[in-house]
Structure formats: structure tokens, C-alpha cells
Amino acid sequence: MSQIKIELIKSINDLNSRGLLLSSKWSSEQLNGLSPTILATPLTNEEQLSIISQPSISSPPIGSNEYYKYILAKNYFDLKEYRRCSDVLIDCNKYQLPIFLRSYATYLAIEKRREEDIIEQQAQQQQQQQQAQQQAQQAQQESQQNDKNNDTNNNNKTDQQQQQQQQQKIEQCQEFKQLFQFYKKLYIENKKDMDGFLLYFYSMLLKKQRDFTMARKVLIESVHKYPCNWSAWSDLSSLCSDSADIIMQLSLPDHFMKDFFLAHFKLELQQNNESLVIYQQLSRTLFTQSTYILAQTAIGNYNLRAYDIGEELFERLIELEPNRLENIDIYSNILYVRDKKASLSMLAHKAMKIEKYCPETCCIIGNYYSLKLEHDKAILYFQRALKLNDRYLSAWTLIGHEFLEIKNVSAAINAYRKAVDINPRDYRAWYGLGQTYQLLKLPLYSLYYFKKATTLRPYDPRMWCAAGGCYEFIERIPEAIKCYERAEENYDRERVAINKLAKLYQEIQNNEKAAFYYKKNLYYCDQEKIDGQEIIDALLFLANFYKNQNQTQSEQYCLRLLDYAGPEKEEAKSILREIHSKSKLSSKSKPK
């Protein structure tokens, strides 16, 4: 127990000293999430010494010249002056801590410049569009020669800007290649001496190079050498294929971090029940106060569509952390689905007070406007979220839904594709793509995306119903029936599958199966006191089906049909007359 506490304390220092702030935050949360008994137990002198001691190859000794340079560089890093940080450590090659910080600072500087270039390009495109509009308006008033001169000047400016951007891209690419070659050589020649952090950074470079197999191999080596780096585990999860079987083949360290990884990975794969079991075990034994586990458990219940439990857990989370915004956009999804306008309005106002310009806040407000059917305002806030973080998955998916609502299919497709690029495991984006192609009357495309969604979420009846609808549209009835049966096996709350199965079996004249599903649907409708055309269809079919088998039952269905107006009522009367005439004939034919 105390060993876990020591490892977490040590990891906070190690991660923070390398600028891995998200991982450091995660370790801090788990440290504070330990049970009160473990936290209250004081550390011995030996344990305190083990926390501050570092391997000789890792950190420069206090008082050395490299240590002074590292302290200065770390301050530059914290102030996001990544180039200055890298410059200070340019000659520090003896210890692994300054090597990592220099490399990471260089990497972040390249990424920062890339993001700035994207913003500049977008601004230039907007400026060019505005200039084109202005020129079109002035074309009627100005002479043709002036127009030609203006076009030439604008084209020259555009060419110069493009040349500058191209030169910057080449320089960034060369810098990245140098960084990659340095780590590749280091790994080949000196892999045994590389610590877990240098291995983790090398895996980041491999991911950028799209060498995912090698990146996964290096990450496994990294978590073996240093298990308490959550970013390494998180990256490993993203590099594993969409099957839990691959985890069994990986050689992972026997460590408490492995349980967190497995729970996270299974949640990503929509194996929600298995994930929740692991989180429950962790929260019962060690991490009884972990808000991270509480949030993940709430998300798991949201994925399972247990919205009441998910809402309760999120409310408990907000009580513990009133100013928390992380994951609270998922809570807003629950309030949206449950049609709780007042609660969602209060949450949106609260989020605005906590942090106005935050992706989560923008998504919460977007959900609020979407619930009010103000789709233009919802789109505006989701776009703001994406300006703040262009890799914010929820915003891409939600803005796709909004574009779909206003029938802007091309924009919806673009948004869903962005979501899939960020996370290929996002079933909502695949499902959304299927819906967009349904609107375009392209059932084969739609079917492809719905099948992707069923692969990612095989226990969700909505995915199977959507795939079944496509098969039905292209008249592949046996495949449609199989999809609807899968939906029915997985508790189709909306009862779409039962109704469809009854009608499809009726269509192919398998009347016994049709009667089975019509009776089942009728039972649920009676239980929920639902009335409508599906009740009439079920009663009429069952009345006809049983008139030659069980006249009493057929009579009961006919009597219920008499309560409805329309042609079905007359047909019920006709069936009743037929039943009565048959019963009279049978009674006359009996021997006296």
C-alpha cells in the first residue's frame, strides 16, 4: 500500500521536472484519491529518501553547471518559451533529464509553429475571400485595366506568402528529421541505457512517422522501465487494435497502472461492463476517493445508456469538485438526452463563470442551444470549441449532429470524418456518417458506416437497427432480419426491431415467426399503455392468423379492433362473422 503512495509521489516529481504536466496531474489526482488510511500513514525516513534519490545517469547533480542550465531551461519551458529552453540545453548531453527536456521543448516548438501556420493560412484565406468579394462589387465602377493591376498585385503578394510558408515547412521538416534520427540512433546503439522517458519520447516521434507497430513496441519498453507515466499508457491504448485479444499478447508489467490501463482501454472499446468492474475493484481497495475513477464510472454508465446512474455520479463529482469542467461536457450530453432544459441551462451558466473560453464550456452551451432547437447558435459554440482545440473529439461529433439537423450534409460528413480521423473508435461518428449517406439515398455507403458502428458497439441495438434498415432498403431481407434479431437480443428499448421483424416475417410469409413478434410487440405496448398503428397492425394480423387455429384468441383480437375506427374495424367484423358461421356449422355437424 505504502509502495503505491511512494511511486505516485515520486512520479509527480519526475513527470513535472520533464514538463509532462498532464501525466503529473493524473498522478496527483490518484495520490489524493488513495484511501484516507493510506494517506494518513506517515512515510519513514528511508521512504522519504527513496523519493528524492535519482539514478546517477538521469539528473545532473545539484550544484553542477548542467543543473544550473536545467533550472533556467525549465523556467523557460514553463513560460512556453520552448526555443530558449532548447538553446540553453544544447550542450547538455551527459544526463537524461536535460536531454529529454531539450527534445520535448524542440518538439513542442515545432508543433506550436505548425499550429500558428494553420491559423495564418486560415486568416489569409478569409482575407482573400473578402478581397474577391470587394473586387466583384467594385468591378462595375472601376475600369478593366485597374482590375487587372489589382489582380497582379494580389497574386504577387499571395505568391510571396506561399513561398515563405513553404520555406518554413521545409525547415520544420528538417528539424523534425534531425530529432528523429538522433533518437533512432540512440535507440539502436544504446537502448538498454535509455530511461522510460526517453523511450516514451521516441515513441511519440514514431507515431508522427506513422510507424505504429514500432511505437507500440517502444511504449511497452517504456512502461516496463517507468510504469507511472499515464501518458505512455494512454498512447499505448490508442495504438492497440480494436480488440481486447491483443492486450493478452502484450508483455505488460504487473503493476497497479496496468489495471488503470485495462479499464481505460476497455472503456474505449465500449466494453463498458468489464471496464466498470475493474474501476469498482480499484475504488473499493485502494483509490476510494479518486475523482478520476468516479468520472470514468459515470462515462461508462453513460455509454451503457444508464443515464439516471450517470447523472447521479456526475452530480456527486460536481459536489466534490464544484469548479471542474473536465468530462462535464459528457454530463451535459446526459441532461440533453433526458430533456432537462433547466438543469442544462444552470450548468451552462456555471461553466461560463468558471471558464468562458474553454472547449468543454462551449460544448455545454452548444448542447443547451441544440436542446432549444436553436441549431445555428449551437453550431457557433461548437465551432468556438474547435477553435480552442481542433482535436476536441466531442465538438466534431456534436457539430456533425447539428449540421445533420439543418440538412447540411456536406458539412456533417466533413465533421464526422474529422472525428473519425482523431479517434477511429468513435462509434457516434461512424453512425453519423451512416445517417448522412442515408439522407443522400446512398444505402451501400450508409451500410458500410453502420457496419463499422456495429463492430465498435456490438451490444447497441440502434446500430443493428440502422444496418437492418439499409439491408431492408436494398431488399436483402434475410440480412435485414439478422440485424433486427441482433438488435432484439440486445434489448431494443424503442422496439423498432420487434415491429420490423414482425413485418418482414409477414412479408416472406413466415407467419408463425411473424405472429411471435407481433404478440411480443403487443405485450410491450400493453405494458407501456402505448396506442397507435403498430397495435392495429398486430391485432389484425393475429386475428387472421388465429382464426383457423384458436378461434377464441382470434375473437379477442377482433373485439379489441372494434374500438378503432377505419377499415380495420370492418375487417374485424368480417372475421368475427366468419368465426361465428364456422362455429355454427361445426355445432350442426356434431352428432346428437
UniProtKB/Swiss-Prot annotation:
Localization, UniProt: Nucleus
Entry's Gene Ontology BP terms: anaphase-promoting complex-dependent catabolic process; cell division; positive regulation of mitotic metaphase/anaphase transition; protein ubiquitination
Pathway given in the UniProt record: Protein modification; protein ubiquitination
Pfam families: ANAPC8, TPR_11, TPR_8
Gene Ontology cellular-component annotations: anaphase-promoting complex
Region of interest (Disordered), residue spans: 129-166
Sequence ranges of the TPR repeats: 66-99, 160-193, 291-324, 359-392, 393-426, 428-460, 461-494, 496-528
InterPro entries: APC8 (IPR007192), TPR-like_helical_dom_sf (IPR011990), TPR_rpt (IPR019734)
Keywords assigned: Cell cycle, Cell division, Mitosis, Nucleus, Repeat, TPR repeat, Ubl conjugation pathway
Family stated for the protein in its record: Belongs to the APC8/CDC23 family.
Function description: Component of the anaphase promoting complex/cyclosome (APC/C), a cell cycle-regulated E3 ubiquitin-protein ligase complex that controls progression through mitosis and the G1 phase of the cell cycle.
Assembly and oligomerization: The APC/C is composed of at least 13 subunits that stay tightly associated throughout the cell cycle: anapc1, anapc2, anapc3, anapc4, anapc5, anapc6, anapc7, anapc8, anapc10, anapc11, cdc20, cdc26 and cdh1.
UniProt name for this protein: Anaphase-promoting complex subunit 8
Organism the protein comes from: Dictyostelium discoideum (Social amoeba)
